[in-house]
Swiss-Prot record:
GO terms for molecular function: aliphatic amine dehydrogenase activity; methylamine dehydrogenase (amicyanin) activity. Keywords: Electron transport, Oxidoreductase, Periplasm, Signal, Transport. Methylamine dehydrogenase carries out the oxidation of methylamine. Electrons are passed from methylamine dehydrogenase to amicyanin. It is found in: Periplasm. It comes from Methylophilus methylotrophus (Bacterium W3A1). It catalyses: 2 oxidized [amicyanin] + methylamine + H2O = 2 reduced [amicyanin] + formaldehyde + NH4(+) + 2 H(+). Belongs to the aromatic amine dehydrogenase heavy chain family. This is Methylamine dehydrogenase heavy chain. One of its GO terms (cellular component) is periplasmic space. Its main location: periplasm. Gene3D superfamilies: YVTN repeat-like/Quinoprotein amine dehydrogenase. InterPro entries: Host-pathogen_enzymatic-act, MeN_DH_Hvc, Metamine_DH_Hvc, Quino_amine_DH_bsu, WD40/YVTN_repeat-like_dom_sf.
Amino acid sequence: MTTFDHPSMIRQPKPTGLAGGLVLAALMLSSSLALADATPNQLGSEITAKLQDETSIAIAPASDSKRVYVLDPGNFHMTSTVYTIDGKSSKLLGMTDAGKLPNVMVASDGKFLAIANTMYSRVARGKRDDYLELIDTKTHQPIADIDIPEGRFLTGVFERTAGLSVDDKHLLFQQFSPSPGVGLVDLQQKAFVKIMNVPDCYHIFPTANQNFFMHCRDGSLMQFTYDSKGNTKQKPTKIFHAEKEYLLNNPYYSNSNNHLTWPTYEGKIFQAKLSESGAEFLKPIEVFTDKEKADKWRPGGWQTIAFHKARNELYLLADQREKWTHKLPSRFVFVVDATSGKRLRRIELKHEINSIAVSQDDKPYLYAVSEEAKTLFTFDAVNGKALSSIDELGRAPSMIFIADK
């Protein structure tokens, strides 16, 4: 307890009458002035700061190639947060609230976010409500709120269980229950259209002219073409990986050049170029040498793969690890040429990293988020130099989203 030995703190006999009232008023005035002089030094200027008459909400600058969005799903909490970050300075620009295990998508021009949400009438129970919000990336205010059927895939935060069409006119989301399906949303009309029936396939990779691909259990891709009413045609591709070549949960896919990159648990990377005319599968790449495989180098994390299109470089998050630990964080990024598989460099992150992403400009940054540190770390993607970081990103930040162009 702190006490102040000041005359004004001593109890005084109560004055009476008019004179007493004047004396009391004088005492109160002198006490106030004296107490002002006795303000503890440790309180600093805050206690005497003038209150603002008006408050305002700042508007973020227009999105650019180094705008970063970090999703904190809070380890299956009922609410999530999307942090908007200036990737050049690691400055926080804004936050957006979301529901349980949301899908976050960035428009090709960076002007809006699309967030597929799930909420319940009694927080963690009660009537389920699935909906889609479009968020202006400057004001962080909703520009559309679209009701969708309750059936969104809720097993984790996967990057490709929902996606914007390549022209940003439609949004596709995966339905898990009561049967496999893909929901179609018309973003121009701001309206849900239809659940399109699909076989037991997963992940959504959009291409031009209202086409998309999904990965099926037999190791093939299925191509779908849809019209404005949600009527579909489908055709399978060849099987491109064996049953025991297990693929990691989050592949990299570019809506702008339709390049699919998908690593296995052991560091083999399958690639394909997708288009309206079909899928062109490229020669797989082995990231690790035989010696590195013997030394137990394997990919690990949540978003483990990134791709810089202009430099034709693949970035794989990896570490020395036992089998079946592929969801645990890693401390290194291996960079290889996407065509030849030639090792270009290895970047030591010096942190337990869950997810990575790479900006698509001519001076790319490597972004790495850590659930443990609740921090987004930024590196020069070419020389690996640590540049900056921003911490206190919620409870368990685990995913990174950037504009594709």
